[in-house]
Amino acid sequence: MTTPTAIRRLDAADPDFARHLDHLLSWESVSDDSVNQRVLDIIKAVRERGDEALVEFTQKFDGLQVASMADLILPRERLELALTRITPVQREALEKAAERVRSYHEKQKQDSWSYTEADGTVLGQKVTPLDRAGLYVPGGKASYPSSVLMNAIPAKVAGVTEVVMVVPTPRGEINELVLAAACIAGVDRVFTIGGAQAVAALAYGTESVPKVDKVVGPGNIYVATAKRHVFGQVGIDMIAGPSEILVVCDGQTDPDWIAMDLFSQAEHDEDAQAILVSPDADFLDKVAASITRLLPTMERAAIVETSINGRGALIKVADMAQAIEVANRIAPEHLELSVADPEAWLPQIRHAGAIFMGRHTSEALGDYCAGPNHVLPTSGTARFSSPLGVYDFQKRSSIIYCSPQGASELGKTASVLARGESLSGHARSAEYRITDPDWKAGNTEDGK
């Protein structure tokens, strides 16, 4: 007999619902002082000893015997070779996914713009891609080629001159799909290094690894901690928490579908969070039964079970309007609207990393091949953050050109405001360009 699932049940009608929900959503990183200090030591070593430190750490942490950095560089030819080592079906899937990701992100490109005022003053914005971006890819046999596509393609669409990928190869293990994805995505350089040392190398540069402007990509607690420390020296995408899915369902979707949608995130790791919200209590019972029945069929059953029982929940609400309120409170990474008319509810969704519309739109499609990016804000940060995109690899500069007439008129306003702040240097700099003698006579120190 299968043991019933121990997934948590919550009811929005409970007077303590808000407190219980807050407890469910709470999550603390496992980073501790010892991890933090080790990361700081690694960063310091890479900054001081460059390639020598990278070789040393690779030998120590990845179990590789390498003589020099030359052994940790993959040429473009190796990426092209990977394309021949994967199956035709795998190559077709990678290329189709890449095509869809590229097509979607092309629509995110921002253009420079300007306008001219009546006196000839020109104001505008110049959009410029980053010079170089660094992509961290977790290594080993269980690495994720989809992450290569999702991180590298937006950078190339943005116009980044050089994308540098780092991927560890523990005990010499390398995933051919990852290298093939790098080839398809247009990655320019690849180094087989990982951990905090790889992040440090990208941020500060070594004799072999070029210094980048931004570091993106997922990693373990050492990688995340290193990204925190190098932020400011370089940009970063985000510090991601555990993966999350929230399904809002009206009770009319196949409960097996919903259970498997919850599993799709729960299988990532034990801290992943999978939540179902529905006004239909009987449907919640059906999904609980599906979870119990389907769990033993999962390859990662132990991980899924720990995640579902530890951080998962089935939440009963009064109606769909309250379900949307709960969704906005949670601000999930992935939100499935598994309802009859998702378009009707979409305007009320304020906080979600990605919104999957309708019963047939599983979150897994977004992870791999729908087109939008799968690098999404977690842990409630969808309240103020957005998915990774082309705009993360572009920056904006303000453009100001003043005609003589414009400088004279704007100078009057600048002078008054600058003197109000007791910044006479600012004021006089603007006043020198004012051509109205009457104004200058009455408003400047020397009347000139």
UniProtKB/Swiss-Prot annotation:
InterPro entries: Ald_DH/histidinol_DH, Histidinol_DH_CS, Histidinol_DH_monofunct, Hstdl_DH. GO terms for biological process: L-histidine biosynthetic process. Binds 1 zinc ion per subunit. The keyword Oxidoreductase applies. Pathway: Amino-acid biosynthesis; L-histidine biosynthesis; L-histidine from 5-phospho-alpha-D-ribose 1-diphosphate: step 9/9. NAD(+) binds at residues 136, 197, 220. Its cofactor is Zn(2+). Its EC number is 1.1.1.23. The active site is at residues 333-334. One of its GO terms (cellular component) is cytosol. The keyword Amino-acid biosynthesis applies. Keywords: Amino-acid biosynthesis, Histidine biosynthesis, Metal-binding, NAD, Oxidoreductase, Zinc. It comes from the Bacteria. Zn(2+) binds at residues 265, 268, 367, 426. Substrate binds at residues 243, 265, 268, 334, 367, 421, 426. It catalyses: L-histidinol + 2 NAD(+) + H2O = L-histidine + 2 NADH + 3 H(+). Belongs to the histidinol dehydrogenase family. HAMAP family: HisD (MF_01024). Catalyzes the sequential NAD-dependent oxidations of L-histidinol to L-histidinaldehyde and then to L-histidine. This is Histidinol dehydrogenase. It comes from Pseudomonas savastanoi pv. phaseolicola (strain 1448A / Race 6). The gene is hisD.
